[in-house]
Regions:
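Alpha/beta-hydrolase-fold enzymes
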Residues: 2-116
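Short alpha-helix in the alpha/beta-hydrolase fold that links the catalytic acid
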Residues: 12-16, 152-153, 162, 176-185
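Short beta-strand/loop motif that positions the catalytic acidic residue
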Residues: 159-160, 166-168, 172
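Catalytic active-site module of serine/aspartate enzymes centered on a nucleophile-bearing elbow/loop
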Residues: 198-236
């Protein structure tokens, strides 16, 4: 899902203000507005993947430099390792990671969510906080790289042999219903259940009753499957 959130307008990772105007959702000269055409969606998604791959290439290049410096360090005769020898990773920033078209266009993967305003989405996308904003070279490859990360929900769930409960929020503005449904379908056995919480948003803000109902459903499922000790059930 991370790549589907990446802002593809960013042309220079060191300066996110250098942007492709036709992919910039906040550029008033961009003629593409919601509802977006299938052609624009395809172009936007391809550009998101391309940006992810550019970052991965930069990460690989920097890791190679670190490995080369570490291997070349001969020491200074003191017996103490140099910093070049110890630096096996490096932190970096990924700017602009909140530009999912679905936030603006609720006809894409429709559910019960409300559209996000451009201003609110800008606050998320342009701010110094956000998904994967601060990471490291190796963390990027492990968790966020489109081609190299093993963090693949459906792929992992296909190997699960134990009972599975998938819970989805019907009005979630961040996680489209297609994702939990894909995860559910990826499970190869039949001891699985899909539960949709009607009207629930991503964070359940102001939805205490829906939250309580979701928790009770999970608890009930765990009791039914024998995953809760009786003492814990009574205490809760």
């Amino acid at each position: 899902i991370f790549t589907e959130w990446l802002d593809p307008a960013v042309l220079d990772e060191s300066n996110p203000s250098k942007r492709d105007p036709e992919l910039d959702l906040w550029n008033p000269q961009n003629p593409n507005k919601p509802p977006f055409t299938p052609e624009y969606v395809a172009r936007f998604r391809a550009a998101q993947v391309a940006r992810n791959r550019r970052i991965t290439a930069q990460v690989r290049e920097k890791l190679a430099e670190l490995d080369e410096a570490s291997a070349a360090w001969k020491g200074d005769g003191s017996g103490n390792p140099g910093w070049q020898q110890g630096e096996r990773d490096r932190a970096f920033v990924v700017s602009c990671t909140q530009a999912d078209l679905r936030r603006l266009d609720t006809s894409l993967d429709p559910n019960g969510r409300e559209p996000t305003s451009l201003l609110d989405l800008a606050k998320e996308n342009h701010s110094p906080v956000g998904l994967a904003r601060f990471t490291t070279l190796r963390s990027w490859l492990s968790q966020w790289s489109y081609d190299e990360s093993n963090a693949d929900g459906p792929k992992s769930l296909a190997q699960i042999k134990v009972p599975v409960l998938v819970v989805a929020n019907e009005a979630d503005h961040l996680v489209p219903l297609t994702h939990p449904r894909d995860m559910f379908e990826a499970i190869q056995h039949h001891d699985k259940e899909f539960h949709l919480v009607k009207g629930a948003t991503h964070y359940y803000f102001g939805q205490n009753e829906l939250m309580a109902g979701a928790v009770e459903h999970v608890m009930g499922w765990m009791r039914k499957k024998g995953f809760l000790e009786q003492e814990f059930v009574e205490a809760s």
